[in-house]
Amino acid sequence: FYLMLPFYKLFPHVETLEVLQIWVVFSAVIPLKLLLSKLNLSKLANILTILWFVLLPVLTTAGGYHLHENCFLVPLIFWVFYFIVNEKKWGILISTILLLLVKEDAFIYVFSIGIFFLTQKRFNLTNKTKKWLVITEFLLPLLYFTLAMYLLSAFGEGGMVSRFDAFLLKDENGVLTVFKNLILHPSFAISHLFMAKKLGYLFLMLAPMCFLPLLQ
């Protein structure tokens, strides 16, 4: 949000923040365009991909509610992808750190990116890059999350565990308990993931992407 401060100083209005939030989200077009240039797709495919991106409802409604730090996730995730595909060591590190700094639970996104690139066969990454990914996409986010939770507990009101209430049993609390239930009680966790309401939500999220994530 400090990146928005100079603009808000010049134009101290609520509308300024809303416009800036939209610009931040759609700045992801830059790393997306750079990433597409590495995929050797046809010109038409590149145009359609960018068009799909800018028309995706979940992005076009980014400024429809209120100012939220999640607006920084979209461009930063694309930058992490771009630097990994190009095997830019320091680019991977810097973009990953910036992504983690958005929020304490951003480590989930970083973990997911790391798992994808270490298991996929689309990009031929060198062993050196894969080792670097283990450090930046697994060890670093784990250390960051541990430190962030400590600081939030010691100097704040703790992490926002309430969003994980579905994975907590009666009278339970804490992030560690969530992880414990995911490991020791997987059927309990799965039963809460695949409820009718949530399956409907997944359908609405995947339909605009033609269910392509399920093919990976």
For each of these PLM feature ranges, what is it?
Residues 62-70:
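Short acidic/glycine- and proline-prone juxtamembrane loop motifs at membrane-interface regions
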Residues 130-216:
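Membrane-lumen/periplasm interface segments of specific transmembrane helices
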Residues 23-55, 74-75, 90-94:
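Transmembrane-helix signature of polytopic, membrane-embedded enzymes
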